[in-house]
From Swiss-Prot:
Protein name stated in the entry: Casein kinase 1-like protein 2
Gene from which this protein is expressed: CKL2
CDD domains the record matches: STKc_CK1_delta_epsilon
Catalytic activity: L-seryl-[protein] + ATP = O-phospho-L-seryl-[protein] + ADP + H(+); L-threonyl-[protein] + ATP = O-phospho-L-threonyl-[protein] + ADP + H(+)
EC number, as in UniProt: 2.7.11.1
Family as reported in the entry's similarity comment: Belongs to the protein kinase superfamily. CK1 Ser/Thr protein kinase family. Casein kinase I subfamily.
Length: 465
């Protein structure tokens, strides 16, 4: 008899796992809907699945928050059934050769600030803001950013909106690479710290790495101390040098906030939206991976033969050549909990992502710039089972320094990294160039162009990691 959960979900293959449980692909036997099923042994030393399920229920209904389908106990396991989502931003960062364009980073920043603001509105801090904990959706929601993993979340105010007290000598909770300065200094976290961590994530996407990655030390505690020292000694100006001043302004604002201050989320979003408009970008949800995936599809599935030049040695479309693996993100990095369960596919480096940032399109007057709108570009990313991610955290290879009375078992974890191979492709391919021009041209919105364009995308294989 096939294994079932809650008498409603069929348990499928394992798609991830780690010290905090195993994640399986599941199917609703009534609707055939695919879901993610996380199992946690009831005898685990620090159970967190029940706590996490309660957090998801508090946040239910929010944009970019996955839905909980079922929670309960089956035999020796606590079980959480939740939405199945697409790849994480860490996965997509690796797919894009570990660098994202300014346009993509700004589109992500807008949604990510919204997600953090919503969590804060519900009186909780996330306390583990990192690329692995933001996933893209599937299908019609492929352009929507989801926030996951509330195992380290903490309530920062009570029902009367009384803020938790300021405290010092706290253990570092979260991921050292993205932890705020005050968190390293042992100060109780508050809303400002989630936002500062997001700033480090955005600079990581733009720069490809952060100055405190790859530091050598004898043990983990010494490594975290070195990360802290490097972070303290790196000024905001040095970190953001060579990038628009809005990023430095973002950090200065976050660090100007007092412990219990309510951040002005609208100001932070406006900073990046004004930059977006000034750069002449269009809020069309065409991310770097959207373009790279389309170009890869042209290599793996060449267009039908026409009465003219054929694809070959003299063609503008070169064959796919796999080169050496890309360097990983740093020695203090840990494999993502998802990476262990999901095989990665060689990513394609079509052209330098810096050049992607220069592709300017007419500025849209559409109010989509202020909303998390899902547009037709989701047809680029048709995820299959092997590329889907559950909306729950699977593992933390953690070192707990000291004890803490908080309910979520505070930990220091190391940030994830991946290494993929590169497939060089000509940017000047007539097929690639024409389709990119369609994306950035005002005429792309016309019905005829979109029909032709979507017809070209039929049968494109989805991202595989």
């Amino acid at each position: 008899m096939e294994p079932r959960v809650g008498n409603k979900f069929r348990l499928g293959r394992k798609i991830g796992g780690g010290s905090f449980g195993e994640i399986y692909l599941g199917t609703n036997i009534q609707t055939n809907e695919e879901v993610a099923i996380k199992l946690e042994n009831v005898k685990t030393k620090h159970p967190q699945l029940l706590y996490e399920s309660k957090l998801y229920k508090v946040l239910q209904g929010g944009t970019g928050v996955p839905n909980v389908k079922w929670y309960g106990v089956e035999g020796d396991y606590n079980v959480l059934v939740i939405d199945l989502l697409g790849p994480s931003l860490e996965d997509l960062f690796n797919f894009c050769s570990r660098k994202l364009s300014l346009k993509t980073v700004l589109m992500l920043a807008d949604q990510m600030i919204n997600r953090i603001e919503f969590v804060h509105q519900k009186s909780f801090l996330h306390r583990d803001i990192k690329p692995d904990n933001f996933l893209m959706g599937l299908g019609r929601r492929a352009n929507q950013v989801y926030v996951i993993d509330f195992g380290l979340a903490k309530k920062y105010r009570d029902s009367n909106h009384q803020h938790i007290p300021y405290r010092e000598n706290k253990n570092l909770t979260g991921t050292a690479r993205y932890a705020s300065m005050n968190t390293h200094l042992g100060i109780e976290q508050s809303r400002r710290d989630d936002l500062e961590s997001l700033g480090f994530v955005l600079m990581y996407f733009l720069k490809g790495s952060l100055p405190w990655q790859g530091l050598k030390a004898g043990n983990k505690k010494q490594k975290y101390e070195k990360i802290s020292e490097k972070k303290v000694s790196t000024s905001i100006e040095a970190l953001c040098r060579g990038y628009p001043s809005e990023f430095a302004s973002y950090f200065h604002y976050c660090r100007s906030l007092r412990f219990d201050d309510k951040p002005d989320y609208a100001y932070l979003k406006r900073l990046f939206r004004d930059l977006f408009i000034r750069e002449g970008f269009q809020f069309d949800y065409v991310f770097d991976w959207t373009i790279l995936k389309y170009q890869q599809s042209q290599i793996s599935t060449p267009p039908p033969r026409h009465h003219g030049p054929v694809v070959g040695p003299s063609s503008a479309l070169p064959p796919a050549i796999t080169s050496a693996e890309r360097p990983s993100g740093g020695d203090e990095a840990r494999p993502s909990g998802w990476s262990s369960g999901i095989p990665r596919r060689n990513s394609g480096q079509i052209f330098n992502s810096g050049s992607l940032a220069k592709q300017k399109a007419p500025v849209s007057s559409d109010p989509a710039i202020s909303k998390d709108v899902v547009l037709s570009s989701s047809s680029f990313l048709r995820a299959t089972g092997s590329s889907r991610r559950a909306a729950v955290s699977s593992s933390r290879e953690a070192a707990v320094l000291g004890t803490d009375s908080e309910p979520s078992n505070p930990q220091i974890v190391e940030a994830g990294s991946g290494s993929n191979s590169k497939i060089p492709v000509s940017r000047n391919s007539p097929i690639v160039s024409s389709e990119i021009n369609k994306l950035s041209s005002p005429s792309r919105a016309t019905t005829s162009v979109m029909k032709n364009y979507e017809a070209n995308l039929k049968g494109i294989e989805s991202l595989h990691f």
